[in-house]
């Protein structure tokens, strides 16, 4: 029997000694969704962030008390502080809470508390978490299960990255970047892949990262389910260590659920799903690339295990409207002689960038790819430097913005000027270094040709570039057409 909203709220209200929940950095992608769910559950929520944004405005419209800037008095009425890994103990709000002996909990611990009374489905992996979580939420909704979800990106169909549902299901991303996913105790866990990223958390020890994923899977109850992508060599390596029921997925013949006959036509990808003891399923997703086929397979594995019928699976996947900044097509820039397809993508690891480039080549093989890329973090650029040089060389035209620091100090030789020099030395193309974001539009104008695909790629403030270009008069735009997030 599906529990009513009141029944679920009554259970969650076992946090009965907690009145006001205060989020430090409430505008962050991982924080705002949890705050929104708690608001919808009837909690008093406040939060602070360094600057106002559409996210903080949305939360304020739901009743959250928002403070701009971090000050000790912001946490005066809090019964618990929720912090992300980016917030340290020197934050004045955290210092005040510690002095007053108010609990300070990581974001994942609050998510775990929400998951405690629900059937939790947690999606982990270095790449593909947001899209896979979104696909699962879409299929569960199509199956009439009305899940609660907390996602790291905006689900376009819902217009939000979090939603309180009326069923027992909670679908959420599980973040390995700070190992905080170990707080979660889901019923079902997905691991999409395991790659060398955020290695500072694991003291540069890849074996420690692998062990942490195994520990995460062992947070499942003995009757839980691990859904694992065996196309990934590291996931395949840890599979014998996982002492829980498993379903595997991938393209290889040994996967429990696999895809064959994959073909791409522009944005849409078609494939056939082969499942053990079930009829083949003809499927399509409105997303390009083999990596998204794998994300869909994880979704199908869980949906089948939960008893969702094939009609709902097909409907939820084929009608999926995408996630913000995951190969998001903004439309066309107008230049002399025709249009240029404008795409925005969040991927910032070499493997993610390579998957996007492969998707572009697969869906539009006869079109030039013009890429504006912003590296994210100096440490990532340093650690994966040669991979970036090789993969970025596959664009036809490349503009490189300076590294988005994300709080890090510059590292000599791990900056975009160095990347430009190294890419130029390979001889495939001559990249252009862009010192200021405001210079991008006039630099692009003479470079673009009708029919090009313009890809804005990265996780930093490049996220504001696509809407800025779309409304730029240089490309036939109107300044009022799209809300702009300014670039420096």
Curated annotation (Swiss-Prot):
<dbReference type="InterPro" id="IPR013221">
    <property type="entry name" value="Mur_ligase_cen"/>
</dbReference>
<dbReference type="InterPro" id="IPR004101">
    <property type="entry name" value="Mur_ligase_C"/>
</dbReference>
<keyword id="KW-0131">Cell cycle</keyword>
<comment type="pathway">
    <text>Cell wall biogenesis; peptidoglycan biosynthesis.</text>
</comment>
<dbReference type="Pfam" id="PF01225">
    <property type="entry name" value="Mur_ligase"/>
</dbReference>
<dbReference type="GO" id="GO:0005524">
    <property type="term" value="F:ATP binding"/>
</dbReference>
<dbReference type="GO" id="GO:0009252">
    <property type="term" value="P:peptidoglycan biosynthetic process"/>
</dbReference>
<comment type="similarity">
    <text>Belongs to the MurCDEF family.</text>
</comment>
<dbReference type="InterPro" id="IPR005758">
    <property type="entry name" value="UDP-N-AcMur_Ala_ligase_MurC"/>
</dbReference>
<dbReference type="GO" id="GO:0071555">
    <property type="term" value="P:cell wall organization"/>
</dbReference>
<dbReference type="GO" id="GO:0008763">
    <property type="term" value="F:UDP-N-acetylmuramate-L-alanine ligase activity"/>
</dbReference>
<dbReference type="Pfam" id="PF02875">
    <property type="entry name" value="Mur_ligase_C"/>
</dbReference>
<keyword id="KW-0067">ATP-binding</keyword>
<keyword id="KW-0436">Ligase</keyword>
<comment type="function">
    <text>Cell wall formation.</text>
</comment>
<dbReference type="InterPro" id="IPR036565">
    <property type="entry name" value="Mur-like_cat_sf"/>
</dbReference>
<keyword id="KW-0547">Nucleotide-binding</keyword>
<dbReference type="GO" id="GO:0008360">
    <property type="term" value="P:regulation of cell shape"/>
</dbReference>
<keyword id="KW-0961">Cell wall biogenesis/degradation</keyword>
<keyword id="KW-0132">Cell division</keyword>
<keyword id="KW-0133">Cell shape</keyword>
<protein>
    <recommendedName>
        <fullName>UDP-N-acetylmuramate--L-alanine ligase</fullName>
        <ecNumber>6.3.2.8</ecNumber>
    </recommendedName>
</protein>
<keyword id="KW-0963">Cytoplasm</keyword>
<dbReference type="Pfam" id="PF08245">
    <property type="entry name" value="Mur_ligase_M"/>
</dbReference>
<dbReference type="GO" id="GO:0005737">
    <property type="term" value="C:cytoplasm"/>
</dbReference>
<dbReference type="GO" id="GO:0051301">
    <property type="term" value="P:cell division"/>
</dbReference>
<dbReference type="InterPro" id="IPR036615">
    <property type="entry name" value="Mur_ligase_C_dom_sf"/>
</dbReference>
<dbReference type="InterPro" id="IPR050061">
    <property type="entry name" value="MurCDEF_pg_biosynth"/>
</dbReference>
<dbReference type="InterPro" id="IPR000713">
    <property type="entry name" value="Mur_ligase_N"/>
</dbReference>
<feature type="binding site">
    <location>
        <begin position="125"/>
        <end position="131"/>
    </location>
    <ligand>
        <name>ATP</name>
    </ligand>
</feature>
<keyword id="KW-0573">Peptidoglycan synthesis</keyword>
């Amino acid at each position: 029997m599906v529990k009513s909203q009141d029944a679920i709220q009554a259970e969650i209200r076992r946090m009965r000694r907690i009145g006001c929940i205060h989020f430090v950095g409430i505008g962050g992608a991982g924080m705002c969704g949890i705050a929104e769910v708690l608001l919808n559950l009837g909690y008093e929520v406040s939060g602070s962030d360094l600057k106002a944004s559409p996210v903080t405005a949305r939360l304020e419209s739901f009743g959250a008390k928002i403070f701009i800037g971090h000050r000790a008095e912001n946490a005066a009425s809090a019964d618990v502080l929720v912090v992300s890994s980016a917030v340290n103990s020197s934050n004045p709000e955290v210092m005040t809470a510690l002095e007053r002996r108010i609990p300070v909990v990581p974001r994942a611990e609050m998510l775990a508390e929400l998951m405690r009374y629900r059937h939790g489905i947690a999606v982990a992996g270095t790449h593909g978490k947001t899209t896979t979580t979104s696909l699962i939420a879409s299929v569960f909704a199509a199956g009439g299960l009305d899940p609660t979800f907390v996602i790291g990106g905006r689900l376009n169909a819902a217009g939000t990255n979090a939603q309180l549902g009326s069923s027992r299901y909670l679908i959420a991303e599980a973040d390995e970047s700070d190992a905080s996913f170990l707080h979660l105790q889901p019923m079902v866990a997905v691991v999409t892949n395991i790659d060398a990223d955020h290695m500072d958390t694991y003291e540069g020890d890849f074996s420690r990262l692998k062990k942490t994923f195994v520990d995460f899977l062992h947070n499942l109850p003995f009757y839980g389910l691990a859904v694992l992508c065996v196309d990934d060599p590291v996931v395949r390596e840890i599979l014998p260590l996982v002492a829980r029921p498993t379903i595997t997925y991938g393209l290889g013949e040994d996967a429990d659920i696999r895809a064959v006959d994959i073909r791409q036509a522009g944005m849409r990808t078609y494939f056939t799903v082969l499942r053990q003891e079930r009829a083949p399923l003809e499927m399509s997703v409105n997303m390009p690339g083999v990596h998204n086929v794998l994300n869909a397979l994880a979704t199908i594995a869980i949906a089948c295990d939960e008893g969702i019928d094939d009609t709902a699976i097909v409907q939820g996947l084929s009608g999926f409207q995408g996630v913000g900044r995951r190969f998001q097509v903004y439309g066309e820039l107008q230049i002399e002689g025709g249009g240029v397809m404008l795409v925005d993508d969040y991927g910032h690891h070499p493997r993610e960038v390579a998957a996007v480039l492969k998707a572009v080549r697969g869906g539009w093989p006869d079109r030039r790819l013009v890429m504006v890329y912003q590296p994210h973090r100096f440490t990532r650029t340093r650690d994966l430097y040669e991979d970036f040089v090789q993969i970025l060389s596959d664009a036809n035209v490349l503009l490189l913005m300076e590294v988005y620091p994300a709080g890090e100090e510059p590292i000599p030789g791990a900056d975009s000027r160095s990347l430009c020099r190294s890419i130029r030395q390979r001889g495939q193309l001559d990249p252009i270094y862009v010192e200021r974001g405001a210079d991008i539009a006039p630099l692009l104008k003479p470079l673009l040709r009708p029919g090009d695909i313009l890809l804005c790629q990265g996780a930093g403030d490049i996220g504001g570039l696509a809407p800025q270009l779309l409304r730029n008069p240089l490309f036939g735009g109107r300044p009022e057409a799209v809300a702009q997030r300014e670039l420096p």
